[in-house]
């Protein structure tokens, strides 16, 4: 009976005394029966069918009544006409579209034989009771009145605990999907002995003790068990309890943190030999063969999840340099670089064991660190920097939940500390230089003041960071290597994340990750030499030596002028596009989430024309390459700019055989 209710007498009593106890199962059943209107037209007994249910004596007396009075009695409806009123979709008494077959049966029965609608009929006839999304929080003892009840569905309610003593012993199916149950202990005080299916998916089951309640001692006849989308983390102990269920054939554990470990499916299949279906996927003989023997060494397998994040090409980026004026001799010299950021969950053990959190599987993979922009180095300098490891460790910042002001304050304090350290380092190493060439300027680390006392001076050194670059609470921001502009920017980024806090990983997958394309703009200015930097005596000595040199050497010396010194402004970071990548499919059993994040069109016909015009003026040696490039069409009607996009793939690592699992133990 779909969301059916108590008996008719219960309905009358509730109608007279007011509503029943709110939140109880019996109240929800009674309320649903009231909405079926089983005692109102065209159901029940009334002037529309009273003569069919009058006692025999009354009918004999009625035959003696004069015909004149007979005309005062309203005309009664036939059973077929009354049934037509509840069956027709155009009738005001028609059933709702979502009405169940049992609801339709009840209404038709109330027309054909309304005298059967009694307590004894409800409690002895119905074998199925479905109360879905009715706000039920308590299963009361009135449920025991259903003597033949075999199926009880209480999905999408507010049940936190069930008194198993109130469950009929005849139950074979108990579905509690989408409630608030935190432990199975309440069901094990007096579990229905004939139960064959138990559904506890999308509840709040948590803790290692739950494995003690899924044994054959409590559920000797259990064939199907759904524990999906809870917070169970201990796979080994859970499988140990499930292995006692000899009749278990269907099992759902996906959506739990324990299903994120690489050996989840193989270990479960090898441990439960009689299992036929796992997470709605049939267990094949080939799978059983591939994972044979894995359960023997289950305790040695690490309880951690492994993800591989791959970022491919970035397309549709606007080249901002075409909008800047040509630099004069006094600057500013403007450089642009582009990279992609994403946030990923932070492990609690990360600070103590950084290598256990992230393992770079590509030589260009670097950890995103907001303070790293102070270095002002290009890609080659980043690879050659001996302090690169220190920067990467420092970039792992912890962001706790809080207001935006608190986050900004913490970020400012962190940047101030880093600036002080870098200022000391720059004093020891001296002022760095800039390498000039015909086509590019390679800018090294800019000099910093020896001391930072005033807050105003410190504020000038801080980078202008877009608020969108701050990671979500509990996550860390990662980024690809900075790349110069091109029509297609290849990131070639791959990072492996190994995480032990599985509950935090599940929460992160439900929330998703934010992927952003960032533009970094740096302004550089020539450094005016001071008298201390260029002493006169040294120059005179050099001039005397130069007089002795031939004229050809002078020309050669002029070409080898020392590189100019530049100072850099704090980098300006701009988020060109940002969007959320949904990772819930990884929790629901998918192995890979692959998508192209589309942030819309940022380029125009005019900007593409400027870019092409600039590229056509480059060195003649690259003329062939320029000809092969795609030229933007001159007609606006045929112009279709490419949207700003980035290719992202996140893979949940899963073992495909027992050999692969054992190799992980060696590594």
Swiss-Prot record:
InterPro entries: Cilia_flagella_integrity, LRR_dom_sf
Record-annotated disulphide pairs: none
Ranges of the LRR repeats in the UniProt entry: 148-169, 170-191, 194-213, 221-242
Keywords assigned: Leucine-rich repeat, Repeat
Biased composition (Basic and acidic residues): 540-553
Biased composition regions of type Acidic residues, renumbered to the chain: 377-386
Residues in LRRCT domain copies: 256-294
Name the record gives this protein: Leucine-rich repeat-containing protein 43
Cross-referenced PANTHER family: LEUCINE-RICH REPEAT-CONTAINING PROTEIN 43, PROTEIN PHOSPHATASE 1 REGULATORY SUBUNIT SDS22-RELATED
Compositional bias annotation for Basic residues: 390-399, 617-627
Region of interest (Disordered), ranges: 1-24, 374-407, 533-570, 616-640
Repeat is among the record's keywords: yes
UniProt feature, compositional bias: Polar residues: 1-11
